[in-house]
From Swiss-Prot:
Its main location: mitochondrion. Disulfide bonds join C33-C66, C43-C56. Belongs to the complex I NDUFS5 subunit family. A motif (Cx9C motif 1) lies at residues 33-43. One of its GO terms (cellular component) is mitochondrial intermembrane space. Residues 87-106 are annotated as: Disordered. The gene is NDUFS5. Signal peptide: none annotated. Pfam families: Ndufs5. Keywords: Disulfide bond, Electron transport, Membrane, Mitochondrion, Mitochondrion inner membrane, Respiratory chain, Transport. Mammalian complex I is composed of 45 different subunits. This is a component of the iron-sulfur (IP) fragment of the enzyme. This is NADH dehydrogenase [ubiquinone] iron-sulfur protein 5. InterPro entries: NADH_UbQ_OxRdtase_FeS-su5 (IPR019342).
Length: 106
């Protein structure tokens, strides 16, 4: 038992928020990766860690991609590099509002 239990004093359960996104959320909004986590938990529930690691790999990989967005960021960086290359070669001119020369907005 902690010396000063702030979570209990204020009625918060922060540990639950940090471990499972499927838990009750403070403003009743589903987290971004709730569906992927739910699929992974449903797949892995009751079969053990070793079997779950093999049999639920697809669900786990989807969940981790949703959390970390590594593939998405790699794709965005590839698109950005290609755009910069085309600009450098003179084959592409970005619109004025992309380079800060557009009309001012109210």
């Amino acid at each position: 038992m902690p010396f000063l239990d702030i979570q209990k004093r204020f009625g918060l359960n922060i540990d639950r928020w940090w471990t499972i996104q499927s838990a009750e959320q403070p403003y009743k909004l589903a987290p971004r990766c709730h569906a992927f986590e739910k699929e992974w938990i449903e797949c892995a529930h009751g079969i053990g860690a070793i079997r779950a690691e093999k049999e639920c790999k697809i669900e786990y990989d989807d969940f981790i991609e949703c959390l970390l967005r590594q593939k998405t960021m790699r794709r965005v960086n590839a698109i950005r590099r290609q755009r910069d290359k085309l600009i450098k070669e003179g084959k592409y001119t970005p619109p004025p509002h992309h380079i800060g020369k557009g009309e001012p907005r109210p």
